[in-house]
Amino acid sequence: MRLLLSIAGLTTVVNALAVRADGNVTSSTAVATPTAWTGFPVPTEYTLPQDDHDFQERKEEIKLKRDTITYVPSIIGETSLFIGGSVGTQIVRQEQAKWIQDLTPVQQDAFREGNASLKAIQDHGGLKTLEDYKILYDGHWSGSVPGGIAQGQFNNFTSDLLFAMERLSTNPYVVRRLNPESDKIPFSVDANNVTHLTGTTLDTLFKSGSLFLADHSYQAEYTAQDGRYSAACQALFFLDQRSGQFLPLAIKTNVGSDLVYTPLDDPNDWLLAKIMYNVNDFFHGQIYHLANSHAVAEIVNLAAIRTLSSRHPVFGLLQRLMFQAYAIRATGEIALFNPGGLFDQSFAFSNVYARKFATDFYPTVAGPFQANYFEEDLRARGLLNASYGPELPHLPFHEDGHKIINAIRTFIGTFVDTVYESDKVLAEDSELQAWIAEANGPAKVINFPSAPLNTRKQLAEILTHMAWLTGVSHHVLNQGEPFTTSGVLPLHPASLYAPVPTAKGGIKDLLPWLPNEQKSVEQISLLARFNRPKIVENNETLLHMFDVKTLLSGTGEAVKAANEQFMIAMGTISKEISTRKFDDQGLSQGMPFIWTGMDPGVIPFYLSV
């Protein structure tokens, strides 16, 4: 039995860079601030600059931070600037030390469980059928991912409804409704097949706003690693008026013979087409989350660090949200996206193309701040309140997300109104206005609200989006989700292991395209290490996002009360999500699997991985 040696090296690599000068690790219950490094005390009460009796000391602190916490070039692609400078580097090392401390028990479990999983499939005689992939999961991974894979994910992996509904749940950031007034049908599909599948024509679906596109054709520009293969799929989906379901219509590979597959093809051909799409989608989800959550939240916060005193209440809130944030990209650069590293070991495309994706998508799709507000993004893609097509029967991402973000908005609204009794007070806050100017200036935040900021509503929107990015959006694509849903084998491999077919028909066995026993366990174990099961017992879940003494004690009774209400709301949402069951049609939220990826009682409040 070959050991999973790729797991063992990560701790050594990260520890080499994650040593604090004093050897200590900051407790997760504190609001980490740079004040420990600048020599200024952590505040016990937050004040606005216009109300501070020692304004000069605030100015000195900010000047020191601006001198010692600087912008340096982006890492892992050309996205946002990273944190540097003498103090900035120490912040990164401190956060890496805490991050590796949290990783270590998960990594140890994953190493042990991975070897047990590999032995189990080898004792079985290897992977001989698609059903054998279940052996890799059954009875394993309870330490690293206690909840296991999502109920229904494996038993229904051939389901077209499952494949389609994943576009509205486990990776909801790609699909969009085609607008008959501004879009074109991206590729043709055999007319007889369309009629058979939909009861109507492709043009009628398009003109009625019932046709949807998920497009990964840009990946045709990428070159797969030796022995790895990938298509660059586009997939069409439609609203079926007969069943009331959101279903797949066709998948186009955009490579080689550029075949177009439909559900009417031979079952193995069609299942392979869905697998090929998922290879593209899996790559997208993992790198999109990096450019959309990490890169965006980091740079907005870095601008705040350089302009807000540690006594500023907004600074205190941001530092809670950004717990451990600067550990992730720095660690990923050396241990995940390094040449031959963990990413290269599993995915079809190397780290070179991960960086290219981040570089290409950050300025256009992933990085714009206001355009990615929760509902704004869904509306822009025609998934919510579309005027040019029928309502989706189910949109699980929004069904859960709108409840969570409304609770976040309520807390943030109280926080902002407590800090600023009027828009006038906000307008007169010199540090806050400097932050907005810095974000639009040296920090180069894309699509950030312009300076000056005039209303409390605008600030509440900014802070709500920051909380959404760090505590919710990130975990839809990362954290435990790839293990439980979006990376479950055999439907979701990180790479193909045989060339994309040049013709349809004649496929008797899909195993040549799928990872073997060793590569399968490597993929599963990598995803297991993304999870953080200890956060529940450590009170680091979304439910506890604002529940930290230093923040609440320094901002007043109204904010404390708002946190209590927030925790009650999160508890209610968590109970609803965690107790989901299938209905009498075998569905949950219109899907043949139970999705719990946004459970506030399980996901972290921060950018965990």
Swiss-Prot record:
GO MF assignments: linoleate 11-lipoxygenase activity; linoleate 9S-lipoxygenase activity; metal ion binding
Residues reported in the UniProt entry to bind Mn(2+): H289, H294, H474, N478, V609
Pfam short name (any one): Lipoxygenase
UniProt-listed Gene3D superfamilies: 3.10.450.60, Lipoxygenase-1, Domain 5
Post-translational events: N- and O-glycosylated.
Principal subcellular localisation of the protein: secreted
Group of enzyme by EC: oxidoreductase
UniProt KW keywords: Dioxygenase, Glycoprotein, Manganese, Metal-binding, Oxidoreductase, Secreted, Signal
Domain Lipoxygenase stretches: 117-609
Glycosylation sites: N24, N115, N156, N193, N385, N539
This enzyme's EC code(s): 1.13.11.-, 1.13.11.45, 1.13.11.58
Signal peptide (from-to): 1-16
One example of a Gene Ontology biological process annotation: lipid oxidation
Family listed: Belongs to the lipoxygenase family. Manganese lipoxygenase subfamily.
Functional description taken from the UniProt entry: Lipoxygenase that metabolizes linoleic and alpha-linolenic acids to 9-, 11- and 13-hydroperoxy fatty acids. Oxidizes linoleic acid to mainly 9S- and 13R-HPODE and alpha-linolenic acid to 11R-HPOTrE.
Protein name in the entry: Manganese lipoxygenase
